[in-house]
């Protein structure tokens, strides 16, 4: 899980989701997991 100021999709399978007011990227590739800090 990377915590970044700006999250974006890395591949076409990444999905942007809002959880508890935070933007999260979930993807089958675990290296692409991100969260907005």
UniProtKB/Swiss-Prot annotation:
Its main location: plastid. Disulfide bonds: none annotated. GO terms for biological process: translation. It is found in: Plastid, Chloroplast. The keyword rRNA-binding does not apply. Belongs to the bacterial ribosomal protein bL36 family. PANTHER family: 50S RIBOSOMAL PROTEIN L36, CHLOROPLASTIC, LARGE RIBOSOMAL SUBUNIT PROTEIN BL36C. This is Large ribosomal subunit protein bL36c. It comes from Vitis vinifera. The gene is rpl36.
